[in-house]
Amino acid sequence: MTNFKWIVAAAGLLSGQVLAAPTATSTHAKRATVSDAAFGYASLNGGTTGGAGGTTTTVSSYAAFTSAVSGDDAKVVYVDGTIKQTADQVKIGSNTSIIGKDANAILEGFGVLVKEKENVIIRNLGVSKVLADNGDAIGVQYSNNVWIDHCDVSSDRDHDKDYYDGLIDITHGSDYVTVSNTFIHDHWKASLVGHSDSNEDEDSGHLTVTYANNYWYNINSRAPSFRFGTGHVYNSYYLDVSDGINTRDGAQLLVESNQFVDSKKALYSTDDGYAVSNDNDFGDSENTAEEGTLTSMPYDYTLLGSANVKAAVVGTAGQTLTF
């Protein structure tokens, strides 16, 4: 049984705090280490440790990055500065931690792909403006134990909805994935779990994904969209997200402690998707999803309470760490 722990932030933190919509960077970056523990689904199945204890490399070019993240030996790869390259996704090996050294660590024009791998951590990394022909900003396929944390993923909405692909797409039966503390913004189709209505044989019983403490801003749809899988979405702030959480094709979601501002469809079903909703502030929108059966998770977690989410998440989610 899940150990539900409600916390109340200090009054001084919450009182009178008004933050601009696109703000995601804290004025005081939090110090982090490569040994920080994953949580949510990524903490199960033996946990997700990435490349902790392995070799350490710092890269600042596309060629160096591509070389450093390949192979399955344990390794920590620090990204220093912005790397610009219009190219297909770079494939990441198992037992890898990709760490942005600070808020300037950005991959622009190309993304990363975790395919048929396990035990991968991506933290404090920016990924932006990856053209649809070059794949998703972050893709996870046929993989287990992946932790995406404190990232900043975006494109723009100046182009049509097919100019870019997904920001974070988790597909092909992947399991034990957590997306946390991430700023997901300025995009048409943000995050997909399960890529096709016809992929039930591969996806059913898999696609176990946690989304926690994320800031979603200026998104048209898929925040996230779940097919077939089992998902937990909690402690997240949604601003100007048209179509929010979509549960479909038999997916079971537990949606808790989120706040929506200026959303048209905050939580809804398509083709027999299901959700259980606890303590969500849907603003002017509502929950129209079919009632689900998922009422607990196989891990401990802390709920902020929907009234406290904005103050806790905005300014903390995104590339707000230093290493």
Swiss-Prot record:
Which reactions is this enzyme annotated as catalysing? Eliminative cleavage of (1->4)-alpha-D-galacturonan to give oligosaccharides with 4-deoxy-alpha-D-galact-4-enuronosyl groups at their non-reducing ends
Query: Which cofactors does it use?
Result: Ca(2+)
What InterPro entries does UniProt report for this protein, alphabetically? Pec_lyase, Pectin_lyas_fold, Pectin_lyase_fold/virulence, PEL
Q: Where on this chain does Ca(2+) bind? A: 136, 165, 169
Concerning Gene3D superfamilies, the annotation shows:
Single-stranded right-handed beta-helix, Pectin lyase-like
Identify the EC number(s).
4.2.2.2
The leader peptide range reads 1-20
**One Gene Ontology term, aspect cellular component:** extracellular region
- Catalytic center residues: 222
UniProt entry keywords in alphabetical sequence: Calcium, Carbohydrate metabolism, Cell wall biogenesis/degradation, Glycoprotein, Lyase, Metal-binding, Polysaccharide degradation, Secreted, Signal
On cofactor binding, the record's note says: Binds 1 Ca(2+) ion per subunit.
Q: Which family does it belong to?
A: Belongs to the polysaccharide lyase 1 family.
Q: What task does this protein carry out? A: Pectinolytic enzyme consist of four classes of enzymes: pectin lyase, polygalacturonase, pectin methylesterase and rhamnogalacturonase. Among pectinolytic enzymes, pectin lyase is the most important in depolymerization of pectin, since it cleaves internal glycosidic bonds of highly methylated pectins. Favors pectate, the anion, over pectin, the methyl ester.
State the protein's name: Probable pectate lyase A
Designated gene of the protein: plyA
